Amino acid sequence: EELGLHYDASIFPVKTFLYGIPDAPTEIHHPLVNGRELALLEVPMSVLKIGGKNIGYSGGFYFRLFPGWLIKRIIRSGHRSGRHSIVYLHPREVDPAGRRLDLPLLESFIQYYNVAGAQAKLAGILRSFQFTSIRKKITCEISEMQ
C-alpha cells in the first residue's frame, strides 16, 4: 500500500510443504495488518475446500498435478457458485527445456513434476473459459463493495 499498490495476489490460503497461510480468507478482501484495514485489496489464490482443508487446484504444482478435466470441473462448479478462479503459472512451469536447479528429491518433484504437460493443459483451459485480468476483476469487486 505504501508503495502505491492497489492489490496484491501473493496469499495462498493453503498449508504446503514450502509455504502458505491455511487460515487466510479465500475471497478478495481488504487485509488487516496490525489492527488496521488496508485500502489495498488482497486477491488470494483459488482453493477448493475438502474435508475442512483448503486445496489448491489452479496454479503451480497443483495445476501440474491434477488432470485438466478435474481443474475444468472445479472451475465450472465455482462459477456456478459465484466464485472466481485464478489460473497462474510461473514461467519455469511451462518451459520443459528450462534450466533445473539441483534440489532435494521432494522439492525437485514439487518444482518440476509434469512441466512438460503444463502448456497443453493451460491451452485447453484457456479454450474452455473466458478469463480477465485481476485488475478488471477487482474493479468489479470494488463496485460491488460500495
Which stretches of residues belong to each language-model region?
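C-terminal domain-boundary segment and adjacent tail
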Residues: 65-146
